[in-house]
Amino acid sequence: MSRVAKAPVAIPAGVEVKLNGQEITIKGAKGELSRVFHKGVVIAQEDNQLTFGPREGVANAWAQAGTARALVKNMVVGVTEGFTKKLVLKGVGYRAAMKGNAVGLTLGFSHPVEHELPEGIKAECPSQTEIVLTGCDKQLVGQVAADIRSYRAPEPYKGKGIRYADENVRSKEAKKK
């Protein structure tokens, strides 16, 4: 049985929460997020906190309630503080630059790669080898970072490619004759 759902989610000052059946909308300084949850989850707002529980007669309702609580907690953090992912390019000639609402990448292909950013995601390139993605939706920030990384994932021999700033790429030894 999940114990995650038993802890309430605190609603900080400046955050507005609207409950409409199974849909919850959270509005804060960084933006607005909305999500519809499983029918087996009971969401209640009491004072400045949200509580989660299972609905009777629904299989795996505690698991769904724990998932809903974790997602709402991330939504609250997203609209107050936001989420950031940092990518680092490593390799000779690998560069990144902003081109309007897209990230332009030079990754050793015969053509430059342009990754269009979805609405709600901001990117900046503090240097030619760094990309910093920010947004209020944790899932979307992570997905965009994974999409950009997939153009040239780090290879294990020289470590060339796009990696997360906190990623540790294990290197292999070259084949011996």
UniProtKB/Swiss-Prot annotation:
Single Gene Ontology MF annotation: rRNA binding
Protein name as it appears in the record: Large ribosomal subunit protein uL6
Biological role: This protein binds to the 23S rRNA, and is important in its secondary structure. It is located near the subunit interface in the base of the L7/L12 stalk, and near the tRNA binding site of the peptidyltransferase center.
Any GO CC annotation of this UniProt entry: cytosolic large ribosomal subunit
Record bears the keyword S-adenosyl-L-methionine: no
GO annotation, biological process: cytoplasmic translation
Coiled-coil stretches: none
Keyword set, alphabetical order: Ribonucleoprotein, Ribosomal protein, RNA-binding, rRNA-binding
The family this protein is said to belong to: Belongs to the universal ribosomal protein uL6 family.
Pfam families for the chain: Ribosomal_L6
Alphabetical list of SUPFAM superfamilies matching this protein: Ribosomal protein L6
Subunit and interaction comment: Part of the 50S ribosomal subunit.
